[in-house]
């Protein structure tokens, strides 16, 4: 009986304490006499300040975006480096190919020179030339320092210079014969024109090979081909020929 009364009293007290006016939320009894544990308080404070707020989310997004930007820039930098290395490798390959081609060309030239050397040695041996005991010096000159027309040291001593070979010998004019007319006399009455010494005539250009011969011919004869001959050189008739006495040939022993 007492138990039933005690339960009824607790139920009445509990209903009155936990009752709430209509329209309001259900009020729960406070825990631990209305005191909150310190651990729960710290957890709540740390949880709120840990990033559930708007500023924390923005900062984290900014950090992630900055990290993604750094990764993109690094990838672009690496891509440019790889492209530059690829171009450099291709250039080196081309240079190596050119060097290899030049090496093969030099090898062919060397083989040909060796064949010529062996041939010359056989020829000299057949003539009995003692070329192995002779001493000579080979002068190596840089390419482009002198032209291909420059004479070698051996030719400079044995052969005359090129200018001396091309220049014609100077000839002294022979004295005119007593019977020949003067240059200004004769039926034509024209003066002889001297041919210039540079090997040129009017309207005719001579090559260096033919110039010395042409100068020599014109200086020897001393007249032009289209000039009229003097009357003393014209052929006479048979009645104007001078008679020559016939001489008997001496008797042979």
Curated annotation (Swiss-Prot):
<dbReference type="GO" id="GO:0051726">
    <property type="term" value="P:regulation of cell cycle"/>
</dbReference>
<keyword id="KW-0233">DNA recombination</keyword>
<dbReference type="GO" id="GO:0006282">
    <property type="term" value="P:regulation of DNA repair"/>
</dbReference>
<comment type="subunit">
    <text>Interacts with NOL3; translocates NOL3 into the nucleus and negatively regulated TFPT-induced cell death. Component of the chromatin remodeling INO80 complex; specifically part of a complex module associated with the N-terminus of INO80.</text>
</comment>
<feature type="modified residue" description="Phosphothreonine">
    <location>
        <position position="172"/>
    </location>
</feature>
<protein>
    <recommendedName>
        <fullName>TCF3 fusion partner</fullName>
    </recommendedName>
</protein>
<feature type="modified residue" description="Phosphoserine">
    <location>
        <position position="188"/>
    </location>
</feature>
<dbReference type="GO" id="GO:0000723">
    <property type="term" value="P:telomere maintenance"/>
</dbReference>
<dbReference type="GO" id="GO:0006281">
    <property type="term" value="P:DNA repair"/>
</dbReference>
<keyword id="KW-0539">Nucleus</keyword>
<comment type="function">
    <text>Appears to promote apoptosis in a p53/TP53-independent manner.</text>
</comment>
<dbReference type="GO" id="GO:0097190">
    <property type="term" value="P:apoptotic signaling pathway"/>
</dbReference>
<feature type="region of interest" description="Disordered">
    <location>
        <begin position="234"/>
        <end position="253"/>
    </location>
</feature>
<keyword id="KW-0227">DNA damage</keyword>
<feature type="modified residue" description="Phosphoserine">
    <location>
        <position position="252"/>
    </location>
</feature>
<keyword id="KW-0805">Transcription regulation</keyword>
<keyword id="KW-1017">Isopeptide bond</keyword>
<feature type="region of interest" description="Disordered">
    <location>
        <begin position="142"/>
        <end position="211"/>
    </location>
</feature>
<dbReference type="GO" id="GO:0060382">
    <property type="term" value="P:regulation of DNA strand elongation"/>
</dbReference>
<keyword id="KW-0804">Transcription</keyword>
<dbReference type="GO" id="GO:0003677">
    <property type="term" value="F:DNA binding"/>
</dbReference>
<keyword id="KW-0234">DNA repair</keyword>
<dbReference type="GO" id="GO:0031011">
    <property type="term" value="C:Ino80 complex"/>
</dbReference>
<comment type="function">
    <text>Putative regulatory component of the chromatin remodeling INO80 complex which is involved in transcriptional regulation, DNA replication and probably DNA repair.</text>
</comment>
<dbReference type="GO" id="GO:0006338">
    <property type="term" value="P:chromatin remodeling"/>
</dbReference>
<dbReference type="InterPro" id="IPR056513">
    <property type="entry name" value="INO80F"/>
</dbReference>
<keyword id="KW-0832">Ubl conjugation</keyword>
<feature type="modified residue" description="Phosphoserine">
    <location>
        <position position="249"/>
    </location>
</feature>
<dbReference type="GO" id="GO:0006275">
    <property type="term" value="P:regulation of DNA replication"/>
</dbReference>
<keyword id="KW-0656">Proto-oncogene</keyword>
<dbReference type="GO" id="GO:0045739">
    <property type="term" value="P:positive regulation of DNA repair"/>
</dbReference>
<feature type="region of interest" description="Disordered">
    <location>
        <begin position="49"/>
        <end position="72"/>
    </location>
</feature>
<dbReference type="GO" id="GO:0006310">
    <property type="term" value="P:DNA recombination"/>
</dbReference>
<dbReference type="GO" id="GO:0005634">
    <property type="term" value="C:nucleus"/>
</dbReference>
<feature type="cross-link" description="Glycyl lysine isopeptide (Lys-Gly) (interchain with G-Cter in SUMO2)">
    <location>
        <position position="216"/>
    </location>
</feature>
<feature type="modified residue" description="Phosphothreonine">
    <location>
        <position position="207"/>
    </location>
</feature>
<keyword id="KW-0160">Chromosomal rearrangement</keyword>
<dbReference type="GO" id="GO:0045995">
    <property type="term" value="P:regulation of embryonic development"/>
</dbReference>
<dbReference type="Pfam" id="PF24245">
    <property type="entry name" value="INO80F"/>
</dbReference>
<dbReference type="InterPro" id="IPR033555">
    <property type="entry name" value="TFPT"/>
</dbReference>
<dbReference type="GO" id="GO:1904507">
    <property type="term" value="P:positive regulation of telomere maintenance in response to DNA damage"/>
</dbReference>
<dbReference type="GO" id="GO:0005654">
    <property type="term" value="C:nucleoplasm"/>
</dbReference>
